[in-house]
């Protein structure tokens, strides 16, 4: 029998109970109904009066196609998930201020309704900042140019636009009857995203902004709880949640809120020039079991299906087009085994113990030097236990409840009845399946070269250098910087070619002088800035310098997005002249947004007939290539092998596949043990090889015959190496 509580302890409990009651009342008031269909207490979310252990997975609707959605959702359900989590992508839905788009891959309502049809719930992360390795963190670029705007702080113009979008999404979900109290699948919403770490560098406006965001969100009366991830000071009734590789250390900021893990990272993203990360499923399962055994009640796998950064949606900069993330369902929609199957078995074990887990707190017993037992006992006598071995190298035999159990290193066994071990996180029974790429189509090419000497009617001239994004508004990756330099008789007397130096904020740059290419330079994920230094041949009189600056995705992490820059910011100098060095930064420059081929729409069937195409262009830079092909037989996923090419973009039947880049991964790829703390540089592959070789082409984009493939090659490559392949396991 437990000792009677002291008066102080009893008073403390009364305060905690009263606080919980006040939060429950606040939540019910925000719901706008007498009894909230979805509420929470300190153990878990409560749905229609029932506490739940909820297993969730992230599937981002724009990173796959509507035709893929039903299959992905069903595979998530078959894998034992209860919830599908997705961000809402502001820049996809409001590409132009006040003009909204909710069709095709951005048909959010259709996606949510498909989840409902499958019998699953939805966690809708409205944000609208998403990070997500998504272009500009999900913010529309036009927001950067709203007068007086300052991002993610206590700023009137920013808050007005953010509130307008959040209310737009909430209103749309309500009008479609998609919140749980309306009979829909949405049980939870999120405002902002990982803002807590920004508060320390965000200045005096950071905390007021976070509080405003929470109050604004609750005021929309969604009828479901709101969360803020990585926001330790999230105000009531908002729940603060954890993101990370591990979250067993986490506790919510109030003892009447449940412990929730909104991003359990199943792997990591790939950047151009980086290795390909892999997270062993034994460690992932171990991390999830650790969280549950310590009272966690909501786990979301980020990502459960990563998908593809189609078009120019990848952020970073330098985030790859593949967003596979080593997820249980791979980029192409196929099961990644053994990860998918092992997690399914974990979920079954957790669900067997769910009634006990949500009704009792664990007691902790030491059963060895590195071993512990977390035991849950319900009032009705039901019992569940988690037996844990934290040693990274040694398997052990332990005794619990009079029985002996084998515990591999770095593992947890789950006993739903405190007797039978039905699952161990390090014991993988599912076979490993290695996917194969099967080349099935080669191409007959035609080519068209960009004219680097011509300027369109939209070009304009201005004194000095300008920031690229302020000109392009991200309508194109490309901006031409063109100027003229007069070389006098005495400037070239030494016989040595002048040295051109160009400083750029990123991300890639090509230099042409008098129409001749003088090479390219580019930055990387860790340092997007770059410098061009090269000897260029010039003649007496007027010389034309053309610099093509290329963006490779806009930053997705930070707070003051209004301060991000890209493009040639200077200085630009010409040296090794007899007259010394010329600073070209402040003279007249002519600017042109985009390439001629983009303006003509060469990536479309109609636009491709606007120019005269010739034979294959080989290794020429800034060249468009096109080919027609028939779709491979069957239904296997399809991918393009671009490993023989340089850098550029791809379209199939006018659909923008994305950026491609044969950028080799730097750094080392050592051995990989599942045991021990995981981080993003552990268990990498492809070091010294291409970060990405294969590019997903959704089947729904193909027709039986006469498909048009268009390639924009910036540097030059070997067209003979390009092929279309099917992916099988």
Swiss-Prot record:
One of its GO terms (cellular component) is vacuole. Keywords: Apoplast, Glycosidase, Hydrolase, Secreted, Signal. GO terms for molecular function: beta-galactosidase activity. Residues 1-35 form the signal peptide. Coiled coil: none annotated. It is found in: Secreted, Extracellular space, Apoplast. Its EC number is 3.2.1.23. The active site is at 194 (proton donor), 263 (nucleophile). It catalyses: Hydrolysis of terminal non-reducing beta-D-galactose residues in beta-D-galactosides. One of its GO terms (biological process) is galactose catabolic process. Belongs to the glycosyl hydrolase 35 family. PANTHER family: BETA-GALACTOSIDASE RELATED (PTHR23421). This is Beta-galactosidase 4. It comes from Oryza sativa subsp. japonica.
């Amino acid at each position: 029998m437990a000792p009677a509580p002291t008066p102080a302890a009893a008073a403390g409990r009364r305060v905690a109970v009263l606080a919980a009651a006040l939060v429950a009342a606040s939540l019910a008031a925000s719901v706008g109904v007498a009894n909230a269909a979805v509420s929470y207490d300190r153990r878990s979310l409560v749905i229609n009066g029932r506490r739940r252990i909820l297993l969730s997975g992230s599937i981002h609707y724009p990173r796959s196609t509507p035709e893929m959605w039903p299959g992905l959702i069903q595979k998530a359900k078959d894998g034992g998930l209860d919830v599908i989590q997705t961000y809402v992508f502001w820049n996809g839905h409001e590409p132009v201020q006040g003009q909204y788009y909710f069709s095709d891959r951005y048909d959010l309502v259709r996606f949510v309704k498909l989840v409902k049809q499958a019998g699953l719930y939805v966690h809708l992360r409205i944000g609208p900042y998403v990070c997500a390795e998504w272009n500009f963190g999900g913010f529309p670029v036009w927001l950067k140019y709203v007068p007086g705007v300052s991002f993610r702080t206590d700023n009137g113009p920013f808050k007005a636009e953010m509130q307008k979008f959040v209310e737009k999404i909430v209103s749309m979900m309500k009008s479609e009857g998609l919140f749980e109290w309306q009979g829909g699948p949405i049980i939870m919403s999120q405002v902002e995203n990982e803002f807590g770490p920004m508060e320390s560098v965000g200045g005096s406006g950071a905390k007021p902004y976070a509080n405003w965001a929470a109050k604004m969100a609750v005021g929309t009366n969604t009828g479901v709880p709101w969360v803020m991830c990585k926001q330790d000071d999230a105000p009531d009734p908002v729940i603060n949640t954890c993101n990370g590789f591990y979250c067993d250390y986490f506790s919510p900021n109030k003892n009447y809120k449940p412990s929730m893990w909104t991003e359990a990272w199943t792997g990591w993203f790939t950047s151009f020039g980086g290795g390909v990360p892999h997270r062993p499923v034994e460690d992932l399962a171990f991390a999830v079991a650790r969280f549950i055994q310590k009272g966690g009640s909501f786990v979301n796998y980020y990502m459960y299906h990563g998908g593809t950064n189609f078009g120019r949606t990848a952020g970073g900069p330098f985030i790859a087009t593949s967003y596979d993330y080593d997820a249980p369902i791979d980029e192409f929609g196929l099961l990644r085994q053994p990860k998918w199957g092992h997690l399914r078995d974990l979920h079954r074990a957790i669900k067997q113990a769910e009634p006990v887990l949500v009704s009792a707190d664990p007691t902790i017993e030491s059963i060895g030097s590195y071993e512990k037992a977390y035991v849950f006992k319900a009032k009705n006598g039901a019992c569940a236990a988690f037996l844990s071995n934290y040693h990274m190298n040694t398997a052990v035999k332990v005794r619990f409840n009079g029985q002996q159990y084998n515990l591999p290193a770095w593992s947890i066994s789950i006993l739903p009845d405190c007797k039978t071990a039905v699952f161990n996180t390090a014991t993988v029974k599912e076979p490993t399946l290695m996917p194969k790429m099967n080349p099935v189509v080669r191409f007959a090419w035609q080519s068209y070269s960009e004219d680097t000497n011509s300027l369109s009617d939209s070009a304009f001239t201005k004194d000095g250098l300008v920031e690229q994004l302020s000109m392009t508004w991200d309508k194109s990756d490309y901006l031409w910087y063109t100027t003229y330099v007069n070389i006098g008789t005495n400037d070239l007397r030494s016989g040595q070619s002048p040295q051109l130096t160009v400083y750029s904020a990123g991300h890639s740059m090509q230099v042409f002088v008098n129409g001749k290419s003088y090479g390219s330079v580019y930055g990387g994920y860790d340092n997007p800035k770059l410098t061009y230094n090269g000897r260029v041949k010039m003649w007496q009189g007027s010389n034309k310098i053309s610099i093509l600056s290329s963006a490779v995705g806009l930053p997705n992490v930070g707070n003051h997005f209004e301060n991000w820059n890209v493009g040639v910011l200077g200085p630009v100098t010409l040296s090794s002249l007899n007259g010394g060095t010329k600073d070209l930064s402040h003279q007249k420059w002519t600017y042109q947004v985009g390439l001629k081929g983009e303006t003509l729409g060469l990536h479309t069937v109609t636009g491709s007939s606007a120019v005269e195409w010739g034979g294959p262009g080989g290794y020429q830079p800034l060249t468009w290539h096109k080919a027609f092909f028939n779709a491979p037989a069957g239904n296997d996923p399809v991918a393009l092998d671009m490993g023989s090419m340089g850098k550029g973009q791809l379209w199939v039947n006018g659909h923008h596949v994305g950026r491609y880049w044969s950028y080799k991964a730097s750094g080392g790829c050592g051995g990989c043990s599942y045991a021990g703390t995981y981080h993003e540089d552990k268990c990498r592959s492809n070091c010294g090889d291409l970060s990405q070789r294969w590019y997903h082409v959704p089947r729904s984009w193909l027709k039986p015959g006469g498909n048009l493939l268009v390639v924009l090659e910036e540097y030059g490559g070997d067209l003979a190496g390009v092929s279309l392949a099917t992916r099988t396991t």
